């Protein structure tokens, strides 16, 4: 019995250490909840004031406070760090709410985020301004982008909201496409960068919403043709794309007439019974629309680019949104490229082959994010840098979604596909759903005898 007790005394700690090591490698959320979060919380609590002081995030106390500390409390007057309002643990890290003293701004804390990360031993520290004078430190305990798991709890918006969770940010929150706030977006990425995965997640999310999806895929529809059950229109050649964009411009003008008749400036101000269905135009390989090798094709290109710019400038008010994707995008594409880019507020740039494409994608809104794009490794497909016109940016990664899964979602919600008369000529043919190989036939053959 004593031998068994000795074995258990030795084996139990070894098994515990081995289990923690396995959890750290295979189940980082479990390891963080059991070990990482308590250790980091204690380290933050006991080293907060000293860390803020050495990182330059303290200010001199006011004259009144210095007088009270020196003469009433009989203590040494120390610099004042930001006041900790709240500390909250999550499955991916810590959330710390700080009240900034007079003399500090959120940019000061953001500039010291790398030093704070090393001081507290976390994977990353992101600074978000929640309201004037208050910031939130979003600490991530491990690399959440190595294995993407979307947050389970999502904020539910109103019934008419157009919010689609697409990817996971490096701070553990969901990256969403909110078409009411950011109506148009530009997504860039080279081959095998994860751009197609991003598109599949976006289409699968939009398929569940009461919107119309318009596809423009000049690769003969090899990317978007499989989603025909949920598409209201599909163009597979540059000529068809030009015709389809012309129809969309006419639809935009008709909707503006509807707004003028009811004296409103936005489609969402109309009564629900009169409100036309929102349309999301998904453009794949936008560079194909700019290419021309003959005089006739140049006329088609100029017409197509002009129509896209018109939609990007005015279509938001009537509920038509652009989602433009491509492998590369530069001013050398021709006239109208920079004008179109200026109207696309949202930017998502995956790994690209040239720095010019990264500059065109993010250089005008977040120049410091360009260097982050060029460091995306090729062995991590789906990683991208997302930014907008506010200057903020973050790294994101799209969860894996196979084409078959995206097609299944489109077939499930095919009943939401709106029937628009003007788009009827471009309605793609829907192939019947293939029958599983192991399914039994409905009718059994009967042999014919004499």
What is each model feature region?
Residues 1-36, 40, 154-262, 276-359, ...:
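P-loop NTPase catalytic phosphate-binding loop
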Residues 30-68, 404-406, 425-447:
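Acidic, low-complexity cytosolic linker/stalk segments
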Residues 35-162, 172-173, 331:
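N-terminal "pre-motor" subdomain/linker immediately upstream of P-loop NTPase catalytic cores
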Residues 114-115, 126-129, 135-137, 143-155, ...:
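Conserved ATP-driven motor cores of ASCE-family P-loop NTPases powering translocation/secretion/packaging/pilus
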Residues 131-139, 263-276, 327-329:
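Glycine/charge-rich, flexible interdomain linkers and switch-proximal surface loops
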Residues 264-279, 428-438:
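Amphipathic alpha-helical surface "interface" segments used
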């Amino acid at each position: 019995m004593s031998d068994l007790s000795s074995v258990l005394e030795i084996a139990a700690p070894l098994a515990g250490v081995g289990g923690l090591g396995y959890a750290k490698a295979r189940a980082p959320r479990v390891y963080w909840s059991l070990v990482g979060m308590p250790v980091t919380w204690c380290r933050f609590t006991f080293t907060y004031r000293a860390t803020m002081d050495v990182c330059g995030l303290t200010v001199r106390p006011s004259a009144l406070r210095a007088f009270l500390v020196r003469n009433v409390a009989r203590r040494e007057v120390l610099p004042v760090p930001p006041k900790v309002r709240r500390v909250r643990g999550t499955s991916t890290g810590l959330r710390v709410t700080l009240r900034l003293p007079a003399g500090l701004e959120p940019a000061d804390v953001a500039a010291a985020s790398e030093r704070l990360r090393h001081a507290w031993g976390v994977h990353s520290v992101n600074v978000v301004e929640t309201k004037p004078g208050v910031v939130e430190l979003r600490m991530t305990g491990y690399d959440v982008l190595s294995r993407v798991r979307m947050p389970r709890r999502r904020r539910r918006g109103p019934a008419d909201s157009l919010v689609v969770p697409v990817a996971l940010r490096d701070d553990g929150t969901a990256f969403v496409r909110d078409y009411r706030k950011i109506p148009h977006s530009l997504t860039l990425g080279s081959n095998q960068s994860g751009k197609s995965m991003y598109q599949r997640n976006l289409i699968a999310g939009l398929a569940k919403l009461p919107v119309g999806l318009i596809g423009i895929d000049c690769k003969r529809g090899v990317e978007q043709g499989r989603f025909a059950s949920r598409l209201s229109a599909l163009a597979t050649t540059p000529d068809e794309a030009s015709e389809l964009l012309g129809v969309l411009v006419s639809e935009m003008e008709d909707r503006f007439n509807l707004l003028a008749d009811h004296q409103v400036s936005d489609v969402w101000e109309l009564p629900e019974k009169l409100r036309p269905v929102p349309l999301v135009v998904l453009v794949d390989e936008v560079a194909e629309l700019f290419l021309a090798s003959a005089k006739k094709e140049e006329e088609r290109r100029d017409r197509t680019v002009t129509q896209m710019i018109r939609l990007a400038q005015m279509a938001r008010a009537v509920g038509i949104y652009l989602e433009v994707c491509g492998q590369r995008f530069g001013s050398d594409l021709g006239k109208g490229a920079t004008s179109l880019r200026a109207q696309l507020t949202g930017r998502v740039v995956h790994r690209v082959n040239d720095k010019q494409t990264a500059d065109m994608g993010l250089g005008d809104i977040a120049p410091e994010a360009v260097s982050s794009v060029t460091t995306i490794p090729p062995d991590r497909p789906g990683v991208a840098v997302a930014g907008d016109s506010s200057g903020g940016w973050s790294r994101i990664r799209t969860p894996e979604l196979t084409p078959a899964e995206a097609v299944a979602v489109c077939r499930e919600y095919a009943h939401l596909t709106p029937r628009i008369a003007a788009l009827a000529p471009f309605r793609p043919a829907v192939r019947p759903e293939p029958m599983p190989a192991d399914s039994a036939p409905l009718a059994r053959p009967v042999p014919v005898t004499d």
